[in-house]
């Protein structure tokens, strides 16, 4: 049952991003939280800095506001393919999981390309019956990341 809840959380998370409902994205996280995008090499070496780093829901909301109002980038959409999570139940009601992902980027002109592959390294907690991410570290397989990394992975 827990595995199904985690898989459902991942599906809803991906759908919100893919459907351009970015304003809902921060709601998948606790406050405080950690959201970071990094490379597999940096993650393996324990380097804290990420391509994107946020440690509160407010920072996630600011990122969405910047995407909507301030940043200029070519219109694009993502399509996530998310694998099944490998769970590691933890202490204090927290659940850890690693989940593989693949993201295809679709540009305004219809061009599609493989944008990112990797795994989500998550710590989740139950808040009032709903699972939320306390930590989501997006570990990209490649250290080469397109400069158009605008939308959350």
What spans do the regions from the language model cover?
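Hydrophobic pocket/interface hotspot
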Residues: 13, 25, 60, 97, ...
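A solvent-exposed, acidic/Ser-Thr-rich amphipathic alpha-helical stretch
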Residues: 31-100
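A generic "alpha-helical surface" signal
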Residues: 4-7, 51, 58, 115
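Short helix-to-loop capping/linker segments positioned immediately adjacent to catalytic or ligand/cofactor-binding
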Residues: 13-15, 68-75, 108-111
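A beta-strand edge to alpha-helix "cap/lid" segment located at domain peripheries
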Residues: 81, 86-153
């Amino acid at each position: 049952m827990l595995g199904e809840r985690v898989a459902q959380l991942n599906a809803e998370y991906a759908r919100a991003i893919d459907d351009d409902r970015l304003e809902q994205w921060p709601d998948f996280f606790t406050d405080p939280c950690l959201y970071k995008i990094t490379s597999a090499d940096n993650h393996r070496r324990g380097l804290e800095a990420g391509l994107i780093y946020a440690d509160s829901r407010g920072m996630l909301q600011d990122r969405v506001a910047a995407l909507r109002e301030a940043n200029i980038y070519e219109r694009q959409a993502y399509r996530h393919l998310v694998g099944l999570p490998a769970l590691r139940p933890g202490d204090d009601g927290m659940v850890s999981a690693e989940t593989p992902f693949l993201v295809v980027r679709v540009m305004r002109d219809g061009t599609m390309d493989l944008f990112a592959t990797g795994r989500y390294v998550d710590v989740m907690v139950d808040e009032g019956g709903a699972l939320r991410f306390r930590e989501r570290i997006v570990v990209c397989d490649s250290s080469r990341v397109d400069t158009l990394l605008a939308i959350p992975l």
